[in-house]
Amino acid sequence: MSRIETDSLGPVEVPEDAYWGAQTQRSLINFAIGKERMPLAVLHALALIKKAAARVNDRNGDLPADIARLIEQAADEVLDGQHDDQFPLVVWQTGSGTQSNMNVNEVIAGRANELAGKGRGGKAPVHPNDHVNRSQSSNDCFPTAMHIAAAQAVHEKLLPAVTELSSGLAELSMRHHKLVKTGRTHMMDATPITFGQEVSAFVAQLDYAQRAIRATLPAVCELAQGGTAVGTGLNAPQGFAEAIAAELAALSGLPFITAPNKFAALAGHEPLTSLAGALKTLAVALMKIANDLRLLGSGPRAGLAEVRLPANEPGSSIMPGKVNPTQCEALSMLACQVLGNDAAIGFAASQGHLQLNVFKPVIIHNLLQSIELLADGCRNFQQHCVAGIEPDAEQMAAHLERGLMLVTALNPHIGYDKAAEIAKKAYSEGTTLREAALALKYLTNEQFDQWVRPENMLAPGGKG
């Protein structure tokens, strides 16, 4: 069953049970591309904008109070997720996001008209353009929704997840702050370090990434709304930009303000590319953490085997008993995806030709995917990997005992050249450092015990 809806191009058949109208239906017909739906976070942000605009237009006397109330009621239902099935459009549409903006306008108008007792859909008493989109353009609504959705996702999902992982790693670091092991540079044995110190680097990297993300948020909270079609604010009343930003801040609890330059807010997306860059920083840190833990857990008998990673599942369909570092692999893969998304976002953001960037949907699609992947990845990695990590103290001690770089502690006492000779002799003859040093008669057994003490090699000023 269907009904007829109309737009400036004429009549269109729309499913009878749909709240959307002609423009949404045309997009479904003309852009049957891929399966990537416009993110619900963007559509909910658009609904929030419609609610805020209705309130501001009502206060300004630009919208009848009864129409404003109907719009707000319908928008609240959208925000509550009651009509998520009414947003079928894909990312691959007009680059301004106009079709998704109209999808939201039509759904809110269609539901508002039903609430008014006039049946589902239609344009009376609530019109999708004249009322729901009053004082707005897709060109300022969509970038505003992009910023709202990104800011909400970072605040509500990403930052708590990064904090959870960072806290878990900090606890692991503190628990093993005295456990001495072999450090490694260039993938080769180096001077000693504690396992706690090693893990503390992970914590610091995550903290830096988190600070980088937070630093981008003030610009993300600057909104394009009020710029309308090209940034001039045509058809928006004086003060509308400031009023709707304040309304959106009150509704969301986030510090949204009006963007100081609406022309840049429509044509450029530097705040979002900055956020994407900070997400890349986090992805790079996560890749390093995952790779290090994967290396330290390699084995169990023919690798480093210095840490035991939790076994989440059997690791092989052919090798019985094999367990793989699957959490590390999943985290590494999502980090790769985030790096790729950053590249796509950067290219799309560079396409702001003249007064409007028309690559907006692909920017926000990739950005929100990165935020979601990083948030889910951090939380999952903490719960299913980090929380169950146990170092193998015996293996660490064995590697430390066999290591040759403890010879570095002898540099201040016998000089670099003699210390290097000891290490070379021990390596070539398969002996210990002690045996090589005594054979060369460069020091006594007592001096070796006094000077080669790993626990004294862990901080500035430390020496044997």
UniProtKB/Swiss-Prot annotation:
Substrate binds at residues 96-98, 127-130, 137-139, 185, 317, 322-324. GO terms for biological process: fumarate metabolic process; malate metabolic process; tricarboxylic acid cycle. Its EC number is 4.2.1.2. This is Fumarate hydratase class II. Disulfide bonds: none annotated. Coiled coil: none annotated. It is found in: Cytoplasm. Pathway: Carbohydrate metabolism; tricarboxylic acid cycle; (S)-malate from fumarate: step 1/1. Involved in the TCA cycle. Catalyzes the stereospecific interconversion of fumarate to L-malate. CDD domains: Fumarase_classII. The record marks 329 as: Important for catalytic activity. Signal peptide: none annotated. It is an enzyme of class 4 (lyase). It comes from Pseudomonas putida (strain ATCC 47054 / DSM 6125 / CFBP 8728 / NCIMB 11950 / KT2440). It comes from the Bacteria. Homotetramer. The gene is fumC. GO terms for cellular component: cytoplasm.
